[in-house]
Design a protein with these regions (language model features):
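Non-heme Fe(II) oxygenase catalytic core, chiefly the N-lobe of the double-stranded beta-helix
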Residues: 2-146
């Protein structure tokens, strides 16, 4: 599939499949975005439902700052809360509860299809996932347009 420039910003959108997913390049998410870039990213998200930004160096502060350019972030998780300093962030790391319990974390194999945080009365309209550690192979996150 062919990458395309969108509107007036310098971003490039490259579809990753026929129906869902696109990679966006030509933007540095660690700095404030101009209104044209925000509009183009939003348009790509509406069209492709899932967008990917590779090679971005974001810490928690930059992650939340970037998210605020697209709306008001919600608490990281309605039941389990979020990060102490950044309540908008909820870790989905495998061992995230290791320090909050006296017993070792339970490692369970995949237990079925699920969608994150959608049981909330007012679920977020989108989620922003950021990977701190990217395995060399074996990632199996899947996306669906419900």
């Amino acid at each position: 599939m062919v990458a395309q420039h969108v509107n007036e910003s310098s971003i490039e959108v490259r579809p990753m499949s026929v129906h869902i997913g696109a990679e966006i390049s030509g933007v540095d998410l660690s700095h404030p975005l101009d209104p044209a870039a925000v509009a183009d990213i939003w348009a790509a998200l509406l069209r492709w439902k899932v967008v990917f930004f590779r090679g971005q160096e974001l810490d928690h502060a930059a992650h939340v700052s970037m998210a605020r350019q697209f709306g008001t972030p919600t608490p990281g998780h309605v039941v389990f809360g979020g990060h102490q300093e950044y309540p908008e962030i909820y870790s989905i790391a495998k061992h995230r509860t290791a320090n909050s319990t006296k017993t070792p974390p339970t490692i369970r194999p995949w237990t079925g299809w699920h969608t994150d945080i959608t049981a909330a009365i007012n679920p977020p309209r989108q989620s922003i996932l950021r990977s701190d550690v990217v395995p060399p192979y074996g990632g199996d996150t899947q996306w669906v347009n419900l």
